[in-house]
Amino acid sequence: MNHGESTVIETVNAAKPNFKKEKLLNAMKYRYATKRFSEKTIPPEDFEVLLETARLAPTSFGLETWKILVIQDKTLREEMKEFGWGIKDKLDASHFVVFLARKKADITFGSDYIRHMLKDVHQVPDEVYEFYKNAYGNFSENDFKTLESERSAFDWAGKQAYIVMAHMMVVAALMGIDSCPLEGFIPKEMDRLLGEEHGLFDTEHFGIAVMAAFGYRGEDVHRNK
């Protein structure tokens, strides 16, 4: 999924949502961490809605410190099973999503990435850029200390990926699409496989934060919420 494109999002002129809260609650009751998926495939237009949901999801400071990989290649999915002790059955789902998070160098103020996001994407004027510099600097160095280490920086960037994943899962439930968030993999080995061996992302800038499977349940639910 591409990020960093200059896009105007019509929030002010967008229609106010108009649906009963019972619909949302029913979707949340219907949703569960699906263990086995059927062979049914999500229609392309429906999955596009989930990708657009990801794009519109909020992130801290609007920096979008994440990226999405949609893994549809069956051969690659088989390779992933070696380093995914808790994802094997879920790799049979209609769509399998890997959420990446940026590393410390990219989320340090003054980096090419942050400058690109603020200047090129959000097109903030110089005075707002300076405000971001002070506010984000204080946040990352003093308040949350996100830049104390490579790990703390990646964990913070990864939190943004989890926000995006959660939004996708909620909208999926509203559409009758099942999902399962996944952490059952070996990050170092999966980074090497997808990033270094297959070249799907630059491991100098990204690491895998979390994964999720989307599709339709292939099992009966035995436990009520």
Model-derived segments and their meaning:
Residues 2-225:
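Acidic, surface-exposed loops and disordered segments
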